[in-house]
Design a protein with these regions (language model features):
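Intrinsically disordered, low-complexity regions enriched in small/polar residues
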Residues: 3, 40, 93-94, 134, ...
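Short, composition-biased local secondary-structure segments
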Residues: 16, 80, 84-86, 92, ...
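Glycine-centered flexibility motif
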Residues: 1, 87-89, 144
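Short secondary-structure boundary/capping elements
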Residues: 8, 40-41, 160-163
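Membrane-embedded segments
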Residues: 22-126
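Acidic, histidine-bearing metal-coordination/catalytic regions of metal-dependent phosphoesterases
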Residues: 1-28, 34-35
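A generic secondary-structure signal marking the coil-to-beta-strand transition
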Residues: 12, 23-26, 90, 138-141, ...
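Conserved catalytic scaffold of divalent metal-dependent phosphoesterases
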Residues: 20, 33-35, 98-186
Length: 186
């Protein structure tokens, strides 16, 4: 995130075949929203998501912004996530901005507590913080990886070893289609 804002979002469609998925599955993935607002209360974004008729919505992080000067829309973003759950179940993992806000609690003036408390009350929102959920109808496991900030350094890259990943998430389920929500800010 370099502070540049896009006034438009882009819809990209991919088709995948995985024989472990029991029936057709439509996923909407929204990442790096960075508190951007598309129309009043993000109605343009929500309408576009609804038009796609997803079975689930995946949010692999950076929905909010941790910079103090740009946090004014955190509540709008949280409300957008709440409205997404009216379209389909939402699976959310943290990115570097959520992690940054969480780790800098003393500097946030209660911003993280307010945001996370609001999210906790949302029905059909599944927070995946180094955890996974099995979704029976499709035979899919959705994993959410929450990396420490050390993995987000831009100049000194810290490799993520497989044993570290396994210690954080456990072993992948070989009989299921496994989906990993992991944020990479580059």
């Amino acid at each position: 995130y370099n502070g540049a804002r896009s006034m438009n979002f882009q819809i990209v469609r991919y088709n995948f075949i995985n024989h472990k998925v029991r029936k057709p599955l439509r996923i909407a993935m929204i990442a790096d929203l960075h508190n951007q607002v598309y129309g009043t209360g993000n109605e343009a974004l929500l309408s576009a998501i609804g038009t796609e008729q997803p079975d689930m919505i995946l949010l692999p992080g950076d929905m909010i912004v941790c910079r103090k000067s740009e946090r004014k829309n955190n509540r709008v973003t949280a409300d957008t996530i709440r409205k997404m759950t009216g379209i389909a179940p939402v699976y959310y993992s943290y990115g570097n901005h959520e992690r940054g806000l969480l780790e800098c609690v003393r500097d946030t003036d209660g911003i993280w507590e307010e945001y996370s408390h609001y999210l906790e009350g949302i029905k059909h929102l599944h927070m995946l913080v180094n955890a996974y959920e099995f979704i029976e109808p499709w035979n899919v496991c959705v994993y959410g990886l929450d990396l420490p900030r050390a993995y987000y350094k831009r100049l000194i890259k810290k490799p993520l070893r497989e044993d570290v990943l396994t210690s954080m998430l456990g072993k992948m389920q070989p009989d299921h289609c496994n989906v990993l929500l992991a944020h990479n800010p580059d």
